Structure formats: C-alpha cells, structure tokens
Amino acid sequence: MDVARVSGWLNNPVGQGWIDPPGCETEYASLPTGDKGCCNIGIVSEHRFAFYYWALQSIEARTPRPILLSLDSHDDVGVPDEVVPDDLDNLRIRDRIELGLFCWLRLRSLNDGHIRPALYLNFFSDAYILLNKDEKPSDEQQRDRAGLTHTIKYYNDMDRVLKDLPPHLPIFLDIDLDFFAKENSNAESRHGSELLKENPEIKSILSLKGPFMMPLLHRIVGLTVALEPKYCGGLRNSLHVLEILNHEFFNDTLCTDSCKWRKR
C-alpha cells in the first residue's frame, strides 16, 4: 500500500460536508417525546460501527451520560485486555474520518468488542445488555480513563431489565437485528442458517405501544441499528426485521426527509 498516497486521500476527501463510514446510514429525528432536541440514528451493517454514532453522541456532552441499552444475540462487550488506552486516549472523535477508520481497523472485526472501549471513553454511564439466550454472562465492570467505574449488566428477561434500569437517566438504544433471530436446529449452527422469530413476536417487542418500548420511549436520546445479515439468516431476513422496525418506530419514514417517530 502506498501510505503517502492514501494519506493524501484522507487529508483531501472528494465531496462536500462530512463523510460517514461505508455501510453506515445517518438519520436525524426529533426526540420521541416531541421535546426540543435531536435523536441521532445510525444504521450500520457491521455492529462495531455503532461506536461511530456513540462517539458523535458523546460530543454533545449530555449530562448525565445516557445508559446504553443493547439488544443482541451475542455478547459484544469485549474483554478488558482489548481496551487499548493508547489507541483510545489519542482518538480524535471529532474527526469523522479518523473515527470511522478506527471503527474499521482498530475495533474487533468480529464485531464483538466495541462496548468496553465506549465505556472507557465515558460515552455512557453504564451498559445494560439484553440477550436472547437462556444463559447470560456474569455482570462486569469497566474503568474509564478518568478512573470511574462503569457497570455492565446482562439480562435475558425483558421485564427484569425494565425493572432495573435507573429511572432518572436517558437511554441510548442499540439494536442488533440478530436479536430477533433464532438458531436453526436442522442446520448445525451454520451462519446464515438462522430463522427469524414470528412476526407477531417481533412486532410486540418493537411496538411503541407494547410493554417493552412504551416505558422506554420518552427516555431515548439516540438509536443505533445493526443489520448483521450473516447472523440473521441472510440479508432478506435482516431487511425484513428492519422493515418492521421502520414501520413500528417511524411509520415507514426512516431515511426520508420527513423521518419522525410514530405517534403512540
């Protein structure tokens, strides 16, 4: 690779305005409550690029820091040894190209190690991970660069996570669409063989009038959605769930000039 030539491209990108990483779609909507303010929305193909949107959200210096509530089929927290202070302390998160390159090249390419780095940089107060499996890891902690401790709590029960969420903190909602997939027992756990949950179950979770989303909605300040088609049983399944999410959350206005949350 011609490093000097590539460096020239990075310092002089073609186009106007900022450039988001490939495979990422940026959207803005008013807050679900209708209050003044903006809800930043990021749609990513690979889950680690959600870090890009979490970083941009953190620039707003919201006080108190929101909780990260992540719905996932896998544990994407990562391990302490893979939090590299030298990388993170020197990351210029206001430089979108540098930030995008960091997500691409320095976060785990398996897309399972982006939450601890976010806590190290104090993007969130704590992380609450809702998994779609019977078994769950033990709760953990992560110190940030200022020495403050952040808690990582795991759940596999929606009612329990709703009960445990601190009522006074805003929420950044992160949804990996493979949360709505299940293992195909006839396919020997091959990636791409997953089956989707039934439509009524998916809709009941995502409905803004449903028992899960309704108590959360007024607290949401940001949203990331990871398509992860390889873990959803293919692109068709992933886009099918995205279509349901778009309808239930945004009344089919996602990625249009009139994107807005569905009225309850």
Enumerate the predicted regions with their spans:
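Short secondary-structure boundary/capping segments
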Residues: 83-86, 189
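Long, hydrophobic, well-ordered secondary-structure blocks that form the structural core
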Residues: 68-80
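Short, conserved acidic/polar surface loops in the N-terminal third of protein domains
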Residues: 53-56, 78-84
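Catalytic cores of soluble, metal-dependent hydrolases
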Residues: 1-67, 90-99, 103-264
